[in-house]
Amino acid sequence: MDGPPPQEEDFSTLSVADRLTHKNWKARVSAYETLVKTFQTTVSDTDPAFKPYINNTDLLKRIVADSNAVAQEKGVDCLVAFVKYAGETAAKTREAILPVLVEKCFGSSRAGTRTQAVELALQYVEVENGGAGVVVRGVSPSHCLDPIFF
C-alpha cells in the first residue's frame, strides 16, 4: 500500500446515455445526478430533454431496479424529477414503472429509497389526470401503502 490512492475515474467525459448503461455504479449515479439537473432546468413539460426517456420504459425500469443500492436511490430520485417536470407527458410511463418500483424499492433496506419510491408513486398520481389517476389497477392506494406505514 505504498503511494497515493488511485484516482477516481472521471465519468463526466462520457455521454449521459453511456453513463446510464455503464457497468460502474458511480457512472450511473453521475448520469442520474446530471439528469436531475437537466430536468430541473427545463422550461416546459414538452421540452426535448424528456423525449429520450418518455418512449424508453425499459431504460426507466433499469434505473428503478438498479443493482447497487446507492445508485438505485439516486435513480429513483432522478425519476421523481422526471415525472415532476415532464408532467402529464411522463404519466404514460406509469404502467411500466410502478410494478418494478413496488417490487424493488418499497421494501428497500435504505430509508431514502423507500421515501423516494413513495414520492415517485405520488408524483404519478399528481401528474396523471389532475390526481385522479389509478396507480395500480385493481388495488386501492391505501392497500398499497399499508405495509409501508403500518
Protein language model annotation of sequence segments:
Residues 7-16, 46-61, 90-102, 129-140:
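Core helices of alpha-solenoid repeat scaffolds
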Residues 68-72, 88-94:
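Short, flexible active-site-proximal loops enriched in glycine and acidic residues
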Residues 1-43:
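N-terminal "cap/leader" segments of large eukaryotic alpha-helical scaffolds
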Residues 11, 30-33, 74, 96, ...:
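Generic alpha-helical secondary structure signal
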Residues 49-64, 68-81:
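N-terminal helical submodule of small eukaryotic multi-pass membrane proteins
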Residues 20, 34-40, 64, 75-86, ...:
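Hydrophobic residues within the alpha-helices of tandem HEAT/HEAT-like
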